[in-house]
């Protein structure tokens, strides 16, 4: 979903993997004039603790940030407010938030084929609205997002075990 959003900005994104424990992680360098698309998967209404831990190593430098919670057609619950809190605590200006519905990572029958053409159009529309907001010159005000504080308790597992047909898609 974040790739579709970035297409709307006509920019090639610099991506950093924060969710896979086996992936090496080097915090990206963020400048104050950058626009950061912070996209995370949602599992049981929360974002991955490893992603948050790694993200906290980034120096935000006051950069603008769009948060994208990608969920598998069930619910995103507290993910947006959790992402907002983490990003704000790090020094980002959270200027927009998107809850993006995608194919479920385990039960593929939910959200099958997503993102699709309609999702691509919607993300392009979001990109246009975000650009207008950035060019408008008005100060950014904190967003009021759905979710609970304190967040619901996180959970672990069950985790699927891949067989030799795994393509390392990351889901």
What are these regions (language model features)?
Residues 1-158:
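FMN-binding flavodoxin-like domain, especially the glycine-rich phosphate-binding loop
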Residues 1, 159-171:
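Cysteine-centered iron-sulfur cluster-binding motifs in ferredoxin-type domains/subunits
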